[in-house]
């Protein structure tokens, strides 16, 4: 199965909207067709109705990423299973369009869908691709960008599971913001007067000019 291609369909759809910034690029049938990328035969089936269909699927796929990113693997799996049930696929062996250097077919598993419309077909392949990614690499490989205000989804393919941002641009922006925050904190600490150690502070008797002994001596004998 072309894991990277199919799972990327889910990321592409989720990131067509940036809720924190109030932007949404999925507004026309042309935008729907652009999501399909190389699958032009499927893209040609798209209609205006698929805009609404895919927006609904997009919200559900984002919920999968959000659940996985928060550590709730069970919820992520349940949400994804619901999509797989609603949008089934049929795996097939394919390879006629790919040839090796000797001209022989490069056989591979292909996710075929028989959906009634382009939106359902996209949902089927995107959901199955994400399911393969989750089961093969782990739910913790599904992430949400940690560089506010960005909330883009991403698939972590790093060797040490260390990815935290959707892009190099967001990673750089987050690092710069963290650096500036540290510099501000250092400046605030430098501007504050140092606190005197408790050992250097005069005791109450010293502040009043009286020692414990003189205070004792001033008490009338009848009160002692």
Positions of predicted regions on the chain:
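Short, glycine/charged-enriched secondary-structure capping and boundary segments
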Residues: 159-161, 181
């Amino acid at each position: 199965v072309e894991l990277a291609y199919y799972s990327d369909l889910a990321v592409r759809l989720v990131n067509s909207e940036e809720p924190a910034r109030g932007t949404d690029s999925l507004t026309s049938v042309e935008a729907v067709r652009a999501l399909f990328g190389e699958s032009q035969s499927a893209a040609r089936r798209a209609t205006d109705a698929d805009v609404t269909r895919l927006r609904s699927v997009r919200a559900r796929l984002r919920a999968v990423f959000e659940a996985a990113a928060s550590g709730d693997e069970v919820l992520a799996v349940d949400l994804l299973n619901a999509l797989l049930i609603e949008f089934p696929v049929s795996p097939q062996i394919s390879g006629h369009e790919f040839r090796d250097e000797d001209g022989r077919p490069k056989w591979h598993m292909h996710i075929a869908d028989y959906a009634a419309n382009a939106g359902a077909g996209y949902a089927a392949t995107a959901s199955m691709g994400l399911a393969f990614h989750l089961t093969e690499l782990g739910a913790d490989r599904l992430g949400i960008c940690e560089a506010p205000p960005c909330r883009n989804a991403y698939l972590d393919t790093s060797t040490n599971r260390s990815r935290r941002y959707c892009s190099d641009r967001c990673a750089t922006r987050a690092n710069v913001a963290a650096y500036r925050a540290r510099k501000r904190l250092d400046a605030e600490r430098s501007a504050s007067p140092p606190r005197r150690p408790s050992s250097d502070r005069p005791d109450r008797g010293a502040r009043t000019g009286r020692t414990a002994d003189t205070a004792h001596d001033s008490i009338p004998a009848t009160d002692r």
